[in-house]
Amino acid sequence: MNFSANKYVAVVDDDESVCRSFSRLLRMAGYLPVEFLSAEAFLADRNRPHFECLVLDVQLGGISGIELGKRLAAVGDITPVVFITAHDEPASRLEAESCGCAGYFRKTDPGETILGTIRKAVESNHNQTANHQPL
């Protein structure tokens, strides 16, 4: 795989323990996780790095993860999004999938399964951006 040196992944979840757990998993896989406890904190951070992938909790207090994904897509941000949720509701799943997310998982799903989707999304995004660079 031909990745950039800094493989940042944002983890946006209002539960600190979930942020820590996902960050630990991502670090073990060679990623550099950056934690945000809300969508608002993510949007307000003007110094955030370029992220290879976003892991967004569906049901955040305030702006939801799905709404954050929609807002980013509306401004042309093509960063892959993986949604996680503690409450897997069919309507939320459909809404997330309609946003073109790379994956949708329950927080209790195996970490390796979620990580596999993150890896594929990052690789696909790299291939897509490499094919669109000027010669």
Region locations from a protein language model:
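Alpha4 helix (beta4-alpha4-beta5 surface) of REC/receiver domains from two-component response regulators
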Residues: 67, 88-103, 109
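Short amphipathic alpha-helix used as the core "switch/output" element in two-component signaling
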Residues: 44, 66-77
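Acidic catalytic/metal-coordinating carboxylates
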Residues: 37-38, 64-68
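The feature encodes the CheY-like receiver
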Residues: 19, 61, 89
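Non-catalytic signal-transmission and effector/linker regions of two-component phosphorelay proteins
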Residues: 1-10, 16-23, 112-135
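Residue-level signal for the "D+5" position in two-component response regulator receiver
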Residues: 35, 60-63, 98
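Acidic, metal-coordinating helix/loop segments flanking the phosphotransfer/catalytic sites
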Residues: 35-53
